[in-house]
């Protein structure tokens, strides 16, 4: 049986941010936010904390295909492997990450629509905390683009509402979290959850292939109080809670993964995100959602970045080509930035 706690609005507001930071600690903290080995179920009346916490904090190790000649079951090795994926263990050296794809609109009873392109990048730096953990310090930007030209959009025509709306891009400065040898623990939910959870070693989902590659998968399913509440943001908010899922895949050279001298790992992979309508689309609480369908990677140079994106970023966001050098606050998600930096759109008046 699940434990239920009465909802308190102030505690929920704190716990939403607490949870977002906890979730961001594993395989992510990206433009649009998250990837972690844990999930949270909430509803409007209560917080529901599952009893089987091991099922949300310890994903299964990649089955029989993962061989034992790399220490896949060693959580300290997994910590360092994750750090080499997310950054570079040559502390102080920054690492480039990139993603590109399409944002699709999904509604019942009709064909899925390609709405906008999406491309972004990040620079990350690691810090050794001296206690077995590492700080990941990140800046990143993500740009919504024209599907035909690849140009960065200033405004967008919404095919569902027949309305042209301003586009709000993603600029997270910073988005930081701590890499540990243990899975992040469920947050306190503003002090409502007092259950003591033991440390659970972090073992990632590795699979080896016959051609010298290693695959890694991870994902997260979230349901949490929205930073944009509909009473204040009637046109931007999808509702009191946000339901978000993210799915990540990574492909590495096994030889590189096995070599600790390769302090920062290159990889290619994919990233998918299922999320409510983006707030700047002004879809309100209408039925449907969006899907980000993207490829991703980390490489030694920025050649994968589209020339148009690089030129736009150099002109408007030059700061984002340099990772932070120290831990700074606040470390917000893109929706938290939206809530602080934007103003609610005027409510449409009826023409009848």
Feature annotation, model-predicted:
Residues 1-18, 22, 40-45:
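N-terminal secretory signal peptides
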Residues 13-14, 34-75:
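C-terminal segment of N-terminal export signals and the immediately downstream linker at the start
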Residues 60-61, 65, 117, 345-352:
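Targeting-peptide/extracellular-domain and disordered-appendage signature
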Residues 107-252:
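Predominantly extracellular/secreted and cell-surface proteins with exposed
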Residues 237-273:
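Mature extracytoplasmic/lumenal regions of exported proteins
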Residues 268-352:
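Edge beta-strand at a domain terminus
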């Amino acid at each position: 049986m699940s434990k239920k706690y009465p909802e308190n609005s102030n505690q929920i507001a704190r716990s939403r941010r607490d949870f977002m930071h906890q979730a961001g600690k594993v395989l992510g903290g990206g433009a649009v936010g998250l990837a972690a080995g844990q999930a949270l179920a909430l509803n409007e009346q209560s917080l529901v904390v599952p009893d089987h916490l091991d099922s949300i904090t310890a994903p299964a190790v990649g089955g029989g295909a993962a061989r034992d000649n790399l220490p896949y079951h060693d959580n300290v090795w997994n910590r360092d492997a994750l750090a080499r994926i997310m950054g570079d263990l040559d502390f102080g050296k920054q690492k480039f990450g990139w993603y590109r794809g399409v944002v699709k609109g999904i509604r019942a009873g009709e064909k899925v629509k390609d709405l906008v392109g999406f491309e972004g990048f990040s620079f990350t730096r690691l810090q050794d905390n001296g206690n077995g953990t590492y700080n990941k310090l990140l800046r990143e930007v993500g740009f919504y683009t024209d599907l035909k030209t690849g140009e960065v959009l200033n405004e967008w025509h919404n095919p569902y509402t027949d309305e042209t709306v301003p586009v709000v891009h993603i600029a997270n400065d910073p988005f930081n979290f701590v890499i540990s040898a243990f899975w992040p623990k469920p947050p306190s939910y503003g002090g409502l959850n007092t259950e003591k959870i033991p440390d659970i070693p972090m073992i990632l989902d590795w699979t080896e292939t016959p051609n010298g590659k290693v695959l890694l998968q991870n994902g997260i399913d979230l349901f949490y109080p929205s930073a944009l509440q509909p009473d204040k943001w009637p046109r931007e908010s999808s509702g009191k809670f946000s339901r978000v899922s993210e799915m990540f895949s990574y492909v590495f050279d096994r030889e590189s993964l096995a070599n600790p001298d390769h302090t920062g790992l290159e990889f290619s992979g994919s990233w998918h995100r299922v999320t409510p309508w983006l707030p700047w689309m002004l879809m309100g609480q209408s039925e449907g959602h969006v899907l980000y369908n993207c490829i991703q990677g980390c490489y030694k140079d920025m050649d994968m970045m589209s020339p148009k994106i690089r030129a736009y970023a150099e002109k408007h966001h030059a700061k984002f080509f340099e990772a932070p050098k120290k831990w700074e606050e606040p470390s917000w998600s893109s929706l938290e930035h939206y809530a602080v930096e934007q103003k609610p759109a005027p409510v449409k008046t009826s023409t009848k």
